[in-house]
Amino acid sequence: MQKLIILLLVAAVLMSTQAVLQEKRPKEKIKFLSKRKTDAEKQQKRLCPDYTDPCSHAHECCSWNCYNGHCTG
């Protein structure tokens, strides 16, 4: 009888730990499956100024224009 009680307690502990681990998995999957920026996107973010930053040529503003010394959208 005592062995049966111990076996049931061990089974209950294992099931509860499995349930706790499964609760954490969806968050990890969401984080893993979320869109990550490519190296090119990270590089462009570093190279491209804000659209209000000063400039002297349009190529300094990436996809914006340089007008009156500032990047314009």
From Swiss-Prot:
Annotated positions of the 6'-bromotryptophan modification: 64
Gene Ontology cellular-component terms listed: extracellular region
Subcellular location: Secreted
Modified residues (4-hydroxyproline): 49, 54
Signal peptide, first to last residue: 1-19
Residues modified to 4-carboxyglutamate: 60
Tissue: Expressed by the venom duct.
GO molecular function, one term: ion channel inhibitor activity
Top-rank taxon: Eukaryota
Keyword entries, A-Z: Bromination, Cleavage on pair of basic residues, Disulfide bond, Gamma-carboxyglutamic acid, Hydroxylation, Knottin, Neurotoxin, Secreted, Signal, Toxin
Pfam families, sorted: Conotoxin
Cysteines paired by S-S bonds: 48-62, 55-66, 61-71
Maturation propeptide residues: 20-44
Record text about domains: The presence of a 'disulfide through disulfide knot' structurally defines this protein as a knottin.
Similarity annotation: Belongs to the conotoxin O2 superfamily.
UniProt name for this protein: Conotoxin Asp7/Gla(3)-TxVI
Species, as recorded: Conus textile
